[in-house]
Amino acid sequence: MNENTNMISAGASIAGRNKRYVLWFYLLNLIFAHFGASAFSDQAHKILDHSLNADKLLHGFNLEIFFEMLMRPEFGPEGAATHPAMWFAILFFLASLLFMPGVLLGYASDHRLPRDEFYRACGRNVWRSVRLFLFFIVIAGIVAGILLRVMNALVNAADKTSNERLPFFTQLIGALIIFLVLTAIRIWFDFAQIDVVLRDQHAVRKSIASGFRRTRRNFGRLLGSYVVIAIVALAVLAAGILLWHAVVPPSSVLGAFIVGQATLLLLLAARFWQRATAVAFYEQELAAPTVEEASLVSVFTAPAVP
């Protein structure tokens, strides 16, 4: 447990030294969200600017008035309002694939990474990151599909028993197992991407194999570290929702914006914290000699016995 705490602290230290990356990604997400929501905002303005019920959405949120606005012919097709948000979400994801190699290189550096090195790492690894993502989607999709089918079968079997609580607990335990398995796969591919970036590995499959071996050797510590950070993120989310309901009045748009954006910023920071912890694990393992290397060193450095 102490080793897990040390690695989590090391990851927090790395992420803290490079907190500008979190801020950059947050601002990029905020800008894309603004443009993505602009189409919906424009269509809503056309109706609310001439509606007596506008105050119920401007100084609060009335679900009935909201759905009434969506159903009015003047609002236009729903796709015209939602498609820009979808495309800007995809654009943010692609930007994350592009810039994450530079972030990982910055995390592994003991000094502030120059801008040209950051962008060089991004450009050199963009296609490798795409290939890693495709491998991740295939493997995680297959595993998640199998686990979901097994869980649904177990829940259906539990429904046929006389124990009324058994289906709920079966679904709860199944969801927890799926979360842990997908977290393990996420760790595996985080290590693979770190290996691609730090070793400048052209063959992505070699980094995937290397990431699998490193994850297997440190599985308990890595999974524990990622789960602890995920629990912290869940606590942040719960605190944000509680503050939203308990502190922010329904009429305060600014208060809701501040609490919501602060929560999203901290959730983004938690994911970067996980990445930094993986980099700390990777660097620690590189610094520590393997068992075979240690045995060879002891053989060649041992004094001769007369």
Identify the function of each model-found stretch.
Residues 90-102, 141-146:
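Mid-bilayer segments of alpha-helical transmembrane spans in multi-pass integral membrane proteins
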Residues 126-134, 215-228:
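Loop-to-transmembrane boundary segments
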Residues 42-47, 143-160, 243-247:
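Membrane-helix interface motif
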Residues 1-12, 16-79, 99, 168-204, ...:
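Juxtamembrane transition segments at transmembrane-helix termini in multipass membrane proteins
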Residues 94-124:
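Hydrophobic transmembrane alpha-helix segments characteristic of membrane transport
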Residues 76-93, 116-141, 165-179:
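Alpha-helical membrane-spanning segments of integral membrane proteins, especially the hydrophobic core
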